Amino acid sequence: MKKVLSIILGGGAGTRLYPLTKLRAKPAVPVAGKYRLIDIPVSNCINSEIFKIYVLTQFNSASLNRHIARTYNFTGFNEGFVEVLAAQQTPENPNWFQGTADAVRQYLWLMEEWDVEEYLILSGDHLYRMDYRQFIQRHRDTGADITLSVIPIDERRASDFGLMKIDDSGRIIDFSEKPKGEALTQMQVDTSVLGLTKEQAQKQPYIASMGIYVFKKEVLFKLLRESVERTDFGKEIIPDASKDYNVQAYLFDDYWEDIGTIEAFYHANLALTQQPQPPFSFYDEHAPIYTRARYLPPTKLLDCQITESIIGEGCILKNCRIQHSVLGVRSRIESGCVIEESLLMGADFYQASVERQCSLIENDIPVGIGTDTIIRGAIIDKNARIGHDVKIVNKDNVQEAERENQGFYIRSGIVVVLKNAVIPDGTII
């Protein structure tokens, strides 16, 4: 895989994941208690022996830069690197990134310097585990100019995706963006061509793009330089290229989830706690997900009742009940609390005991969850200070609300408490 360079698209302003992207780039959003979204594609690359990795981003890239610099240091005897490339304005191009393809186009001068044969283009907000070596080998074996990784899906979910049709050789011959009705029926294909059994093919007669592509070097450069007005890979570049180039489909038949919205992000995190077998597991020593080593102490539990939950390292939990939840590193939960079906991202630091005591005496709220607080169906971002006897339960079943001055939003019925927010004692949300 020395002849492959990976480009991870960090996305735009992250409006679908707002307010989690208020102070950070989308790839830097914490996931599963201790990781960040960027760790998923980077780990997949490392496990696939791809060590040349660029991450393209446009907004709030400081925490992403810091995380990557501390985590992925390939100094030594190979050419490996993980580098963040932020959008920049130049005399030749005064614009920011206009789309996924435009982001790559603006850095072609840098990509060109490397002696590689293929470019692997990935998204920064998906949860999955994939060996890209098999994907790239299929690309080479079929002599493809472009290969798309696709998933088989059933009729119920099909209209939510960009679908495609293939011929008997696996070549993509048609695209349709989120079709409905008769247009949807026309996009049915025989997915057994890609390796499914007849029974599986009948249940899942559609294929959808995962937003993962591999390009021949000369094809990528030609398409981006000749079609300057086309700014998006999935909607413009690849559908147009399928007319003149050999665009192949590669079937990925394992867990894959786009977690680019608050609702999908919330459910994907809580699904990690499912028993006996979650849909995605971080407990795979043959293909681990890497992240920054923090050297934190073990978690301390004092008279707690915990069921179906994930607790990050360095947490302190006192006489509380945690059910079907994910708690991030350095989470602090005081006595009498009930946390149900919630994602707590933890904290970036510990408050000293003296500082916490002074905060309580002065009626300030320390970092963490105060005594007798109930949190249900919520996401609590990092370093939140939640007082005692608070109820975050969305009691009125509100679906959408913006209360930034009060420290929270509601997205798809999920209460999202902002990073560094302060929720006073006795508050009911």
Curated annotation (Swiss-Prot):
GO molecular function: ATP binding; glucose-1-phosphate adenylyltransferase activity; structural constituent of carboxysome shell
Keywords, comma-separated and alphabetical: ATP-binding, Carbohydrate metabolism, Glycogen biosynthesis, Glycogen metabolism, Nucleotide-binding, Nucleotidyltransferase, Transferase
Residues involved in alpha-D-glucose 1-phosphate binding: G162, E177, K178, S209
Catalytic activity, as annotated: alpha-D-glucose 1-phosphate + ATP + H(+) = ADP-alpha-D-glucose + diphosphate
InterPro entries (alphabetical): ADP-Glc_PPase, ADP_Glu_pyroP_CS, GlgC_bac, NTP_transferase_dom, Nucleotide-diphossugar_trans, Trimer_LpxA-like_sf
Known EC number: 2.7.7.27
GO BP annotation list: glycogen biosynthetic process
One family name in Pfam for this protein: NTP_transferase
One Gene Ontology cellular component annotation held by this UniProt entry: carboxysome
Pathway recorded for this protein: Glycan biosynthesis; glycogen biosynthesis
Annotated Gene3D superfamilies: Hexapeptide repeat proteins, Spore Coat Polysaccharide Biosynthesis Protein SpsA, Chain A
Tagged with keyword Cell inner membrane: no
Sequence similarity: Belongs to the bacterial/plant glucose-1-phosphate adenylyltransferase family.
Role played: Involved in the biosynthesis of ADP-glucose, a building block required for the elongation reactions to produce glycogen. Catalyzes the reaction between ATP and alpha-D-glucose 1-phosphate (G1P) to produce pyrophosphate and ADP-Glc.
Subunit structure: Homotetramer.
Protein name (Swiss-Prot/TrEMBL): Glucose-1-phosphate adenylyltransferase
Organism (species): Nostoc punctiforme (strain ATCC 29133 / PCC 73102)
